[in-house]
């Protein structure tokens, strides 16, 4: 059984975002006070915002992308507008995150 290509694209987008967010978070805390596997994505995003790495606007876009990706990954309905939002914003957000550290 193969997953629909849109669902695969959403998974890849979320995977890449989480990887970059975790990279920045781990690098900031250096020696992790808690294992990063136990720091949820929401905690990592909040920390990056509080540490000044993310603006409120960028954090909002990331949260929206992650929410849309979660719907698709769990086989819930995702509109064409939502798919386009993820496709049109993920690359820019990843470039933004890659430039941090």
Predicted regions and their residues:
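Amphipathic alpha-helical interface elements
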Residues: 1-54, 60-67, 80-101
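Short C-terminal capping segment of an alpha-helix within the protein kinase catalytic domain
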Residues: 69-72
